Curated annotation (Swiss-Prot):
Protein name: Putative ankyrin repeat protein R229
Keyword Repeat applies: yes
Pfam families found in the cross-reference section: Ank_2 (PF12796)
UniProt ANK repeat ranges: 135-164, 165-194, 196-224, 226-254, 256-284, 286-307
SMART domains: ANK
Domain of life: Viruses
InterPro entries: Ankyrin_rpt, Ankyrin_rpt-contain_sf
Alphabetized UniProt keyword annotations: ANK repeat, Repeat
């Protein structure tokens, strides 16, 4: 137990408070922050991407570049504040899948407890629904690809709920077009209707027809959120997704004709023509023509006039 006495592990306390009784340091150490080497159910993980990215983009915090083995924070460690740049962030196995949008690689985190430069705090923004820590240095294991089903099987073997946080893994996989993973999650209890059927909306918005199809096969509601799925497919020009959604019950006149409005706005001629055949009323056609004139899209206007 003597190895703990020189290890700076604190929970939202200034570094100068570390000069207290050794028993108190031990209490902080054993009661909350570190059970990873003493309890089989406390396992830490981190999600990383291919390259360092700032928090306003998809990726990990700030400018740390991560590799297998010992990683040391490139700037001075900060003991106060939340989501600050002075520290390497990670969480435990029960929370790791809540941070999927930070990258595509899962890494096991071990703590260099014997390293005198090791400092660790629990982030003050941590709550019952989302817990994270940061440390001055950590030991990262090999990368496991979160796009691979085998990685999720590994997490399941540790008792991780792979449908955590309103089925975030399903919504994440659908938004990125990971068909095999989407099917695996659905076959293992994921709720296709989670978050107001967000999975099918995200897959439609990002153009993944095969994912849209399997979600609908498993019962996804294509009319959810005021037919958001078809609206986004019309906006981004995904003709086949628009057709599939309409043939499976999506409303081409949803939200006061928004599908044809947005398709016309973005000049998606094939979609505009398809939508016009769903409602041959002059009101619908005139609406599209007005938008084409406003945008001076004479090519599309010609299509509308001749259709």
């Amino acid at each position: 137990m003597s190895q703990f006495n020189n290890t700076n592990i604190i929970e939202n306390t200034p570094i100068n408070k570390m000069h207290q009784k050794k028993s108190n340091i031990l209490d902080i150490f054993t009661l909350d922050n570190i059970r990873t080497n003493h309890s089989s159910d406390k396992v830490f993980f981190k999600i990383t991407s291919d390259k360092p990215l700032s928090t306003d983009k998809l990726g990990q915090h700030f400018d740390n570049t991560y590799h297998t083995g010992l990683n040391i924070c490139s700037i001075p460690f900060e003991t106060k504040g939340s989501c600050v740049d002075g520290g390497i962030y990670f969480t435990d196995k029960d929370n790791i899948l809540k941070f999927l949008f930070y990258g595509i690689y899962l890494r096991k985190v071990d703590l260099p407890l014997d390293d005198p430069g090791f400092i660790m705090v629990k982030d003050p923004d941590s709550c019952a629904s989302s817990v994270k820590w940061r440390a001055s240095r950590v030991i990262l294991g090999n990368r496991l690809n979160l796009r691979d089903i085998s990685t999720f099987k590994y997490l399941m073997s540790l008792g991780v709920d792979i449908n955590v946080d309103n089925d975030k893994p399903l919504r994440w996989a659908a938004s990125r077009g990971y068909y095999g993973l989407v099917k695996f999650l659905l076959d293992n209890g994921a709720n296709v209707h989670a978050y107001d059927d967000e999975a099918v909306q995200l897959a439609s918005r990002n153009g993944y027809l095969n994912v849209v199809k399997i979600l609908v096969e498993y019962g996804a509601n294509v009319n959810a959120n005021n037919d958001y799925a078809i609206q986004m497919a019309c906006k981004y020009g995904y003709n086949e997704i628009v057709r599939f959604l309409v043939f499976n019950g999506a409303n081409p006149m949803a939200n006061r004709y928004y599908p044809i409005e947005i398709a016309t706005e973005f000049g998606n001629k094939l979609i505009v023509r398809f939508l016009l055949h769903q409602d041959k009323s002059m009101v619908y056609k005139s609406y599209a023509m007005d938008i084409a004139v406003r945008n001076e899209n004479w090519d599309l206007l010609n299509v509308l006039l001749l259709d």
